[in-house]
Amino acid sequence: MEEPPLLPGETIKDMAKDVTYICPFTGAIRGTLTVTNYRLYFKSMERDPPFVLDASLGVINRVEKIGGASSRGENSYGLEIVCKDIRNLRFAHKPEGRTRRSIFENLMKYAFPVSNNLPLFAFEYKEVFPENGWKVYDPIWEYRRQGIPNESWRLSKINEHYELCDTYPAILAVPVNIPDEELKRVASFRSRGRIPVLSWIHPESQATITRCSQPMVGVSGKRSKEDEKYLQAIMDSNAQSHKIFIFDARPSVNAVANKAKGGGYESEDAYQNAELVFLDIHNIHVMRESLRKLKEIVYPNIEETHWLSNLESTHWLEHIKLILAGALRIADKVESGKTSVVVHCSDGWDRTAQLTSLSLLMLDGYYRTIRGFEVLVEKEWLSFGHRFQLRVGHGDKNHADADRSPVFLQFIDCVWQMTRQFPTAFEFNEYFLITILDHLYSCLFGTFLCSSEQQRVKESLPKKTVSLWSYINSQLEDFTNPLYVSYSNHVLYPVASMRHLELWVGYYIRWNPRMKPQEPVHNRYKELLAKRAELQKKVEELQREITNRSTSSSERAGSPAQCVTPVQTVV
């Protein structure tokens, strides 16, 4: 059986026999290549067990033809497929078989449906799961969990129809003493109308994390009394501190350069009691180039002799360090300094999302559970308008687009670094993080499609597509960390130092069979979870037994016929 197992809504579009997969690790393998409207599937019966390569079309970045009909040499005529998840796939066709053209055309059509006016596969996929993952995040419930509304913060529906800001969610948490009319004036002074709104409030000190975009200061140093009053209101909502910190994610030279485009940063003269801190995190273009360099050194082969210097030259871990260090400073100001903070970059949907979501993960144990993490992604990334469509390029053949960048990948990498430093603090495991990244590209689920809440509502994604959380929550045992201990009120302070960071081998080098763990970790997780459940059950039984014994002892102690010496129960 060489055909792929099909998902509901998946259909075969093309098939070519006698194709050779040029595996960079084990050499050439001959088999059958199938293209469906969702995946590329290669199967070879030459190996035992049969060799299978299964990749979603959404992961394809570009497809190139290699060699012409007159190419000499074995395996010199075929296709090179460059993927978004580090891999490159190379297939050789027989020139006389005429299968290359057909496979190429179908790959170009179904890997890039947006460029061909076709629907993404998420709209065709019809799997039914026990739970509707689109209902995981309810903003009203999440704000209520944080104690909002309260005497200082209210929920505004001014953006109900996305008219104040088309990249913000419908419901916004804002200072209680700033009326909606004033919010409009603040929006006119913030890039793309992205006003400072609440992300998180400390349950004890009431110190807050608010997020926004840069102020439109420009070269002339424009001011807005409404914006200044607004930030003062944010500061005043926290009685513990008479100061507010503004964390600008950018390097200061970039922030200054933005003035020429009408943007800029808050001057400490205009914003009384505010302190401005630059976090030196580079822009999307620098990050894209860093990942390109990383791919060069990890795939397909690793050069042992210069591994450390090669890794250093990519600057990837340096960028991860700066993002983690920035989030750590924010979390520390809120937790230890009891001070409210405002976070922004240029537009407030890339570096800002990285910083707020990571600092929330450090401060609030709820987000370290599986469901809490799903809420965090829905809230800080999806509802606040991270431009997934542009950064990932779902179904778009324009692989050289300057808007592409691994912003969300860096966030997940930072989360993985935290799970390494705190192995018992997170309910989810590494496989959970890898699954999220795989489906960032796959276009199987609707979760990461579009670039704003408004677009998702307009496209009716919750009605027409399946949520990734529906799938994950239907098999939680696969994604659960058996070492997890629920200390919900613990604040995590990861060490953001190069000595404590390492390359995420389980993701970036997972295609190399030599890097696979000797023992399948996944199976071990399941065994540990079963053992944990068994021990938990025993503990509960013993606790019940102790309760029953102490109850019967106290009953006997209270009866008139009780002897003078009480019976002591030692457990």
Swiss-Prot record:
<dbReference type="InterPro" id="IPR004182">
    <property type="entry name" value="GRAM"/>
</dbReference>
<feature type="binding site">
    <location>
        <position position="284"/>
    </location>
    <ligand>
        <name>a 1,2-diacyl-sn-glycero-3-phospho-(1D-myo-inositol-3,5-bisphosphate)</name>
    </ligand>
</feature>
<feature type="binding site">
    <location>
        <position position="348"/>
    </location>
    <ligand>
        <name>a 1,2-diacyl-sn-glycero-3-phospho-(1D-myo-inositol-3-phosphate)</name>
    </ligand>
</feature>
<feature type="binding site">
    <location>
        <position position="350"/>
    </location>
    <ligand>
        <name>a 1,2-diacyl-sn-glycero-3-phospho-(1D-myo-inositol-3-phosphate)</name>
    </ligand>
</feature>
<feature type="domain" description="Myotubularin phosphatase">
    <location>
        <begin position="133"/>
        <end position="508"/>
    </location>
</feature>
<feature type="active site" description="Phosphocysteine intermediate">
    <location>
        <position position="345"/>
    </location>
</feature>
<dbReference type="InterPro" id="IPR010569">
    <property type="entry name" value="Myotubularin-like_Pase_dom"/>
</dbReference>
<keyword id="KW-0443">Lipid metabolism</keyword>
<dbReference type="GO" id="GO:0004438">
    <property type="term" value="F:phosphatidylinositol-3-phosphate phosphatase activity"/>
</dbReference>
<feature type="binding site">
    <location>
        <position position="349"/>
    </location>
    <ligand>
        <name>a 1,2-diacyl-sn-glycero-3-phospho-(1D-myo-inositol-3-phosphate)</name>
    </ligand>
</feature>
<keyword id="KW-0472">Membrane</keyword>
<dbReference type="GO" id="GO:0005737">
    <property type="term" value="C:cytoplasm"/>
</dbReference>
<feature type="binding site">
    <location>
        <position position="349"/>
    </location>
    <ligand>
        <name>a 1,2-diacyl-sn-glycero-3-phospho-(1D-myo-inositol-3,5-bisphosphate)</name>
    </ligand>
</feature>
<dbReference type="InterPro" id="IPR030564">
    <property type="entry name" value="Myotubularin"/>
</dbReference>
<dbReference type="Pfam" id="PF06602">
    <property type="entry name" value="Myotub-related"/>
</dbReference>
<dbReference type="GO" id="GO:0052629">
    <property type="term" value="F:phosphatidylinositol-3,5-bisphosphate 3-phosphatase activity"/>
</dbReference>
<feature type="binding site">
    <location>
        <position position="351"/>
    </location>
    <ligand>
        <name>a 1,2-diacyl-sn-glycero-3-phospho-(1D-myo-inositol-3,5-bisphosphate)</name>
    </ligand>
</feature>
<dbReference type="GO" id="GO:0046856">
    <property type="term" value="P:phosphatidylinositol dephosphorylation"/>
</dbReference>
<protein>
    <recommendedName>
        <fullName>Phosphatidylinositol-3,5-bisphosphate 3-phosphatase MTMR2</fullName>
        <ecNumber>3.1.3.95</ecNumber>
    </recommendedName>
</protein>
<dbReference type="GO" id="GO:0016020">
    <property type="term" value="C:membrane"/>
</dbReference>
<feature type="binding site">
    <location>
        <position position="258"/>
    </location>
    <ligand>
        <name>a 1,2-diacyl-sn-glycero-3-phospho-(1D-myo-inositol-3,5-bisphosphate)</name>
    </ligand>
</feature>
<dbReference type="GO" id="GO:0031901">
    <property type="term" value="C:early endosome membrane"/>
</dbReference>
<feature type="binding site">
    <location>
        <position position="284"/>
    </location>
    <ligand>
        <name>a 1,2-diacyl-sn-glycero-3-phospho-(1D-myo-inositol-3-phosphate)</name>
    </ligand>
</feature>
<feature type="binding site">
    <location>
        <position position="391"/>
    </location>
    <ligand>
        <name>a 1,2-diacyl-sn-glycero-3-phospho-(1D-myo-inositol-3-phosphate)</name>
    </ligand>
</feature>
<dbReference type="InterPro" id="IPR029021">
    <property type="entry name" value="Prot-tyrosine_phosphatase-like"/>
</dbReference>
<feature type="binding site">
    <location>
        <position position="283"/>
    </location>
    <ligand>
        <name>a 1,2-diacyl-sn-glycero-3-phospho-(1D-myo-inositol-3,5-bisphosphate)</name>
    </ligand>
</feature>
<dbReference type="InterPro" id="IPR016130">
    <property type="entry name" value="Tyr_Pase_AS"/>
</dbReference>
<feature type="binding site">
    <location>
        <position position="347"/>
    </location>
    <ligand>
        <name>a 1,2-diacyl-sn-glycero-3-phospho-(1D-myo-inositol-3,5-bisphosphate)</name>
    </ligand>
</feature>
<feature type="binding site">
    <location>
        <position position="258"/>
    </location>
    <ligand>
        <name>a 1,2-diacyl-sn-glycero-3-phospho-(1D-myo-inositol-3-phosphate)</name>
    </ligand>
</feature>
<comment type="function">
    <text>Regulates the level of these phosphoinositides critical for various biological processes including autophagy initiation and autophagosome maturation.</text>
</comment>
<dbReference type="InterPro" id="IPR000387">
    <property type="entry name" value="Tyr_Pase_dom"/>
</dbReference>
<feature type="binding site">
    <location>
        <position position="346"/>
    </location>
    <ligand>
        <name>a 1,2-diacyl-sn-glycero-3-phospho-(1D-myo-inositol-3,5-bisphosphate)</name>
    </ligand>
</feature>
<feature type="binding site">
    <location>
        <position position="351"/>
    </location>
    <ligand>
        <name>a 1,2-diacyl-sn-glycero-3-phospho-(1D-myo-inositol-3-phosphate)</name>
    </ligand>
</feature>
<feature type="binding site">
    <location>
        <position position="346"/>
    </location>
    <ligand>
        <name>a 1,2-diacyl-sn-glycero-3-phospho-(1D-myo-inositol-3-phosphate)</name>
    </ligand>
</feature>
<keyword id="KW-0963">Cytoplasm</keyword>
<keyword id="KW-0967">Endosome</keyword>
<dbReference type="InterPro" id="IPR003595">
    <property type="entry name" value="Tyr_Pase_cat"/>
</dbReference>
<dbReference type="GO" id="GO:0005829">
    <property type="term" value="C:cytosol"/>
</dbReference>
<feature type="binding site">
    <location>
        <position position="350"/>
    </location>
    <ligand>
        <name>a 1,2-diacyl-sn-glycero-3-phospho-(1D-myo-inositol-3,5-bisphosphate)</name>
    </ligand>
</feature>
<feature type="region of interest" description="Disordered">
    <location>
        <begin position="544"/>
        <end position="571"/>
    </location>
</feature>
<feature type="binding site">
    <location>
        <position position="283"/>
    </location>
    <ligand>
        <name>a 1,2-diacyl-sn-glycero-3-phospho-(1D-myo-inositol-3-phosphate)</name>
    </ligand>
</feature>
<feature type="binding site">
    <location>
        <position position="391"/>
    </location>
    <ligand>
        <name>a 1,2-diacyl-sn-glycero-3-phospho-(1D-myo-inositol-3,5-bisphosphate)</name>
    </ligand>
</feature>
